[in-house]
Regions:
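Conserved Rossmann-fold SDR core element
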Residues: 152, 161-177, 212-218
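Substrate-binding pocket helix/loop in short-chain dehydrogenase/reductase
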Residues: 86-87, 94-96
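C-terminal helical subdomain
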Residues: 171, 187-225
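N-terminal Rossmann NAD(P)H-binding glycine-rich loop of SDR-like oxidoreductase domains
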Residues: 10, 18
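The beta1-alpha1 cofactor-binding region of Rossmann-like NAD(H)/NADP(H)-dependent oxidoreductases
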Residues: 49-60, 92
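Catalytic loop of short-chain dehydrogenase/reductase
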Residues: 122-150, 155-156, 160-163
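Conserved NAD(P)H cofactor-binding loop of Rossmann-fold oxidoreductase domains
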Residues: 78-83
Length: 225
């Protein structure tokens, strides 16, 4: 059974990821700002309250890994922060708040986990179709979509930098999934796929995708958005 870190586990896809991985017998370190009741009491899930926007808060993860796991088989960078605001009203502070979670949080957590990653480990970053060059873009998502483009490039670079160690880095760029975040970005829109359905795909990819992919971006979308 594998040791897997999942971020953004308080709701939506992240919550489903933690539950589905645990149901398969894997050990999950569930990271979110608030800890949901649904994850408490599960013997395969350990929860940490961590704000990815604050680098110092991530020391909790480092402490846990050094004292408990000693090895990380996979990371799913699922946590995300969204801002829906016209570009003309989007300040540098707004951009920074989004990037602190969506980009810096990914980079900092990966760096902390690096000593525990090994040959065969798989780091999966959940991006968005909005971060794909040439994809359909939507007004008001400048900070969010550009941050999702940034982590795509980051993952490609890390795949190259750590290929000799046998650590795989891949990105899943998701289309519309019925989550609270989608409702915030596109009020009233009904997505064709549920959080549980998408989580199942991500779980399968995390466990097996590194056998076939490294440094790749897979577009997981059947609709626009």
């Amino acid at each position: 059974m594998k040791n897997i870190i999942v971020t953004g586990t308080s709701r939506g896809i992240g919550l489903e990821l933690a539950l589905q991985l645990a149901a398969k017998g894997h050990h999950v370190l569930a990271i979110s700002r608030s800890i949901p009741q649904a994850l408490l009491g599960n013997e395969n899930i350990s929860c940490l309250s961590v704000d990815l926007a604050h680098e110092s808060d991530l020391q909790k993860v480092g402490d846990y890994l050094s004292s408990t796991w000693k090895q990380v088989d996979a990371i799913i960078h699922n946590a995300g922060s969204l801002l829906l605001k016209p570009f003309s009203e989007t300040s540098q502070t707004d951009f920074e708040s989004i990037y602190k979670v969506n980009v810096f949080g990914v980079a900092n957590l990966t760096r902390i986990a690096l000593p525990y990653l090994q040959k065969g480990s798989h780091v999966v970053t959940i991006s968005s179709m909005g971060g794909i060059q040439g994809s359909l873009k939507f007004p008001g998502l400048a900070a969010y979509s550009s941050s999702k483009g940034a982590v795509i490039t980051l993952s490609e670079l890390l795949a190259e930098e750590y290929k000799e160690q046998g650590i795989a880095f891949n990105v899943l760029a998701l289309g519309a999934v019925q989550t609270e975040m989608l409702a915030e970005a596109f009020p009233g829109y009904q997505a064709p796929i549920s959080a549980a359905e998408m989580a199942k795909y991500i779980v399968d990819f995390t466990l097996t995708g590194n056998q076939y992919y490294n440094g790749k971006v897979l577009e997981v979308s059947s609709s626009n958005p």
